[in-house]
């Protein structure tokens, strides 16, 4: 009887694993590989930096951190 219980538990784990794989796995956090640093969005919301396409004189002024007389989104 104990062997049957263990067998049923193993079968349940295998079936749930298979269902998880078929659905595409667990929901994963999407990573934005193009972002230079993450605090940029927070700085922009708080008004601590200039958003992209805004005028600038140094990279520290821009939320994206890239200044060429205006804030650029990418380097």
From Swiss-Prot:
Where is the protein found, in the record's own terms? Secreted
Q: Which GO terms describe its molecular function?
A: ion channel inhibitor activity; toxin activity
Propiece residue ranges:
20-45
Q: List the disulfide bonds.
A: 49-63, 56-67, 62-71
Family to which the UniProt record says this protein belongs: Belongs to the conotoxin O2 superfamily.
This protein's domain notes: The presence of a 'disulfide through disulfide knot' structurally defines this protein as a knottin.
Protein name, per record: Conotoxin TsMEKL-011
Q: Which organism is it from?
A: Conus tessulatus (Tessellate cone)
Lineage summary: Eukaryota, Metazoa, Spiralia, Lophotrochozoa, Mollusca
